[in-house]
A protein has these predicted regions:
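FNR-like FAD-binding dehydrogenase module
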Residues: 1-630
Length: 630
């Protein structure tokens, strides 16, 4: 039976930017394991086209980023797949299934998934079932379409690849063995003396995470120069203007993003250690060791930056690498059910894994934003074996923020060797009270709010999806960025000013750049208003239109401004070859702005509704309508 099973090999691949597609891939991997496939999970960039043909089936999960682009960790794979040297039919021995993660508030919904799917078909690969697609705007989120699709996938896998005679799928109530387990680094479990320090009470102020730098692939060291609150203390939201100096010279353009890697706070880590009864071993050096399940697999380590030689402690893992404050997924409850001796707790945990109780799961987790730590505090009978913690608690991922400045090198001071690159961010600190009257804080923004001048942290810099180039300088831009969506617009305004100084263009633009902004109050969260006025007074070809939704009885939003100034927008776009940029919250805002644009095109272009929509689609196809929302 072992030989027969080894012939049923599944390769699960993902292209992910925020981690959602990776979560989906790992769940698909568990499904395949339960059907007794020898399963490997990896990012798309980690495999060659040749490897696609070395597995019985390839299962793909991919999200769409930017303007219908593939995530960075899949672009090398996509480049290889698009090679003109590949002949039609070269992948005819490949069987696959794919699931896309998208957002219907974007014009190019699930575009990356569809491009990848169609290219695989073009090269001869054959799907074993219909492709699946999720919508971020679905009331039930990803699960709304993922759960039905996985049922179809399971049936297709069993039909195409029947289990060896005498074998049955691994039941859902049987725990899958992780590929890697934690073990003591030394037989005597020597306590750590150089890792994260033990935490304790710090009097009136909350103790902050340690300042040790993290080892991240492509990681850069950034020094905090300022972390200023822009909104008054009386305002409901704390919004920060964070300024960082990054070691070295790093070119970036408007729309690019900086990823900050947060840490959990000592108070939460201590609570987790305490409820799991891990205090005696929390600071002992540990390492990862392969389990029996990884004998025939090239499984990656639970912490991507680790090697088999790396050592750590439970406290370090919980501080730097495990997301103990994230909202748990269904699979988390299934795993917890194995680690309780309380029958009531076990039954309740298993209820949350049943698709019939999806509304109850939503009401328990997503609606009140209940965290993993809080779940464990409520199900106090659950005791996770420390050896398996990395297979149960999800990885703590970096958070991306659109850069709010143009690229500027900072002259090194006598105390600093080498060049530094200034990067500024506009960040809304997530802190609110839930329906169950508990204070919630964003993991990343709570960490960011704690940063102090001269503190160092690890960041990475990556390309965004706006595609701004200097060649567009002779065209006006229409920038629509309410709230913190103004961050990349500020970068764009600054960058265009820099480019004009560096390379004066002979033909001055015949239309001003237009910036549309909205917030709640003119005196509370009108970000960079003095800066806009200074630019305009100095002759920068810029007009700024701002709306304040709470300063009068009738609420005014950014789409209302677009309607009011639709003549200028149409002239800039239709007559001056202008480019439209939209940034900010996903969901209703981009759709409302899109509708306002279409109505303006109808009015000033004397177009029918159908022709106005076609005009907007043409702008998208030509790269003159670009959206980056989150």
């Amino acid at each position: 039976m072992g030989d027969l099973q080894s012939l049923r090999r599944a390769l699960v691949l993902y292209g992910s930017e925020t981690g959602n597609a990776q979560d989906v891939a790992e769940e698909i991997g568990r499904l395949a394991e339960r059907l007794r496939f020898d399963t490997e999970v990896a990012e798309l960039n980690a495999v060659s086209l040749k490897q696609l043909l070395q597995h019985d089936v390839v299962l793909i999960s991919i999200s769409t980023t930017g303007q219908g682009d593939l995530p960075p960790n899949s672009q090398a794979f996509w480049k290889a797949l698009r090679s003109a040297r590949l002949r039609p039919g070269c992948l005819q021995r490949m069987r696959f299934a794919s699931f896309g993660l998208g957002d219907t508030s974007y014009p190019k919904y699930n575009w990356a998934h569809r491009k990848l799917y169609n290219r695989l078909i073009q090269l001869g690969a054959r799907p074993i079932c219909d492709r699946g697609e999720s919508d971020e705007q679905h009331p039930e989120g990803i699960d709304g379409s993922f759960l039905p699709w996985t049922a179809t996938l399971r049936n297709s896998l069993l039909q195409e690849y029947p289990l060896p005679e005498g074998s049955e799928p691994i039941p859902d109530n049987v725990l899958l063995e992780p590929k890697w387990l934690l073990d003591f680094a030394d037989s005597n479990g020597i306590a750590s003396t150089n890792g994260t320090a033990k935490s304790g009470s710090n009097g009136d102020t909350e103790e902050r995470p340690d300042q040790a730098l993290l080892e991240i692939p492509g990681g850069l060291t950034a020094n905090v120069t300022s972390n200023d609150r822009l909104t008054p203390m009386t305002h409901w939201q704390d919004v920060r203007h964070l300024s960082l100096d990054v070691e070295g010279s790093h070119a970036y353009v408007p729309g690019d993003v900086l990823t900050i890697y947060p840490k959990n706070f000592p108070t939460d880590v201590d609570q987790f250690i305490s409820i799991m009864d891990w205090t005696p071993i929390a600071d002992q050096r540990m390492k990862f060791a392969p389990s029996s399940a990884s004998v025939s697999s090239t499984a990656r380590l639970p912490v991507p930056t680790f090697t088999v030689e790396s050592t750590t402690t439970l406290r370090e893992l919980l501080t730097n690498h495990l997301d103990i404050l994230s909202i748990p997924r269904r699979s988390f409850f299934a795993k917890l059910a194995h680690y309780t001796s309380d029958e009531f707790h076990r039954d309740r945990l298993l209820e949350f894994t049943d698709p019939e109780y999806i509304d109850e799961l939503f009401d328990y987790t997503t609606r009140p934003r209940r965290s993993i730590l809080e779940v464990l505090q409520e199900f106090e009978s659950v005791k996770i074996p420390w050896q398996r913690v990395c297979s149960i608690i999800p990885t703590l991922r970096g958070r991306q923020f659109s850069i709010a400045s143009a690229m500027t090198e900072v002259s090194p001071s006598p105390a600093v060797k080498g060049a530094r690159t200034r990067i500024e961010l506009l960040i809304a600190i997530v802190k609110y009270k839930t329906v169950i009257k508990r204070i919630r804080q964003g993991v990343a923004t709570r960490y960011i709010a704690s940063l102090t001048p001269n503190q160092q942290l690890t960041v990475t810099l990556s390309r965004g999806g706006l595609g701004v180039t200097q060649n567009e300088l002779n065209r006006p831009v229409v920038m629509i960025g309410p709230g913190t969506g103004v961050a990349p617009m500020r970068a764009l305004v600054q960058q265009r000013i820099q480019w004009r100084h560096q390379t004066p263009i002979p033909d001055t633009p015949t239309a001003n750049d237009l910036l549309f902004f909205s917030c709640r109050n003119a005196e509370s969260d009108y970000f960079f208003k003095d800066e806009w006025r200074k630019h305009i007074d100095s002759g920068v070809p810029l007009e700024v239109f701002a709306a304040f939704s709470r300063d009068q009885r009738q609420k005014v939003y950014v789409q209302d401004l677009v309607r009011q100034q639709s003549g200028k927008v149409y002239d800039a776009v239709a007559n001056k070859s202008g480019i439209i940029y939209i940034c900010g919250s996903s969901g209703k805002m981009p759709q409302a702005v899109r509708e306002a644009l279409i109505e303006g095109f109808q009015e000033h272009g004397e177009l029918s509704r159908e022709d106005a929509e076609a005009f907007l689609v043409a702008l998208e196809k030509s790269g003159r309508y670009r959206q980056e929302t989150w």
